[in-house]
Amino acid sequence: MKTHLKFKNTNIGIVFTLLLTAVIADGCTSNKKQITFSEHIAPIIHKNCTSCHRPGEAGPFDLISFNDVRKKAKTILKVTQSGLMPPWPADTSYQRYIGERYLTQVEKQLIFDWVDAGCPEGPPGPEAPVFPAGSQLGVPDVIIKMEEPYLIQGDNKDRFMVIKIPYELERDTFLKFVEFVPGNRRLSHHVNGHIIQYSINDKQNIFEGPRVVNREDVGTLDSCYRFLKLLNDDGTYPLLTPSVFNYLPGVTPQIYPSGVGGYRIKKKGAILMRDIHYGPTPKNATDQSYVNLFFDSVPPKRPFMETQLGTLGISEIVPPLLIPPDTIMKFVTKAIIYNDISLVTINPHMHLLGKSFLAYVITPSGDTIPLVRIKEWDFRWQYFYTFRNMMRIPGGSVIFAEGVFDNTVNNPNNPFSPPREITGLGGSMRTTDEMFQLILTFLPYQQGDENISLENVTPQMKGIQ
């Protein structure tokens, strides 16, 4: 049976209809919770943005308080909806890593709705995160600091430098961790650090030679070593322990479980920042960065090993890395893994013509193991991606890397206009030349490695509770 409401008085019908509409509208509004800064937006900003966007850091403005964020609301909306910020080039639908910084669609929608509603503040709170002023790991045993501040010219140009800091310890020792602390956090954009080690009679004066050289001035790695006088006295290369630290703004140093990693080092050596990128500045500035060494009382049980595919690595690039002007080209490199390994970290590397990067493993059984996919290469953000658990790669597997390079006028990062032929054949360190590398940090596989989590490891150090 249907019930029909009829109104003899038109005015009564209109009033009833308006009241009914108001009730329905009010019901919808009450069910939709207001998006506020303190409840919804602050946790997103503090987790993904504040570590860089705070006083003295690399971000161009602060994003800490409600007023900070409200003033930049339109900018935040634009860069988050486009995916430009927070910077995380790797495709998280392809592989997952520790320390990911990206926004989910739900978080992007919250930001959109908040800005659209006029940026309401909401109730007081939450408290802004607290960041340690110096070490994030504890009290170091030794601090190795640049002897003199390095002058960064105020000419609005990026600089890619190589810096050495020689040192002499009391004796040969073991290291648990190495931590880089930038002296100028606003301009220090990324650093890849290594340790050069000298045996007692290999080099009499480890303190000779210049401390700094511009990568653009030396070209090859060999020229760099010779200019900085890093070679042994007989002209041979010293022992290099690679990738003992890596730095990007806002990135927390990676801590590994007990028994994993660590280093043996000689008493005489040098910290080699083989790739330190200073961002542009309109005014002269200085940097006097330092490195914290944390000793260990026992030798490392499972020190990391490193290899690289492609440029200066164990595998050839096909076709040879030569990119004619006005072309978009794909290059491939591959290498066989002969024994089972536990893969820990990967680092894709290209220069300014890079367009996309893909790396994966094909196992002997024909399975594919995804490593990393970067759909839109960004030279400014070259992470060392650490897997959440060690990744077992069976012996007999083949690791593939595919890189696409764009040497056209449509590439906004192309260093030349009009485009020129760009080569990567000589292993040049100049950013205007090219490289195509995949760097792997790994261990020989042990039973159960794939079950070892690399997340949320608490360092057992002095000064850490």
Q: Predicted segment positions?
A:
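Bacterial Sec-dependent N-terminal signal peptides
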Residues: 1-35
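Short acidic/polar inter-strand loop motif in beta-rich domains
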Residues: 118-122, 279-283, 404-413
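Extended, compositionally biased non-globular segments
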Residues: 336, 344-430
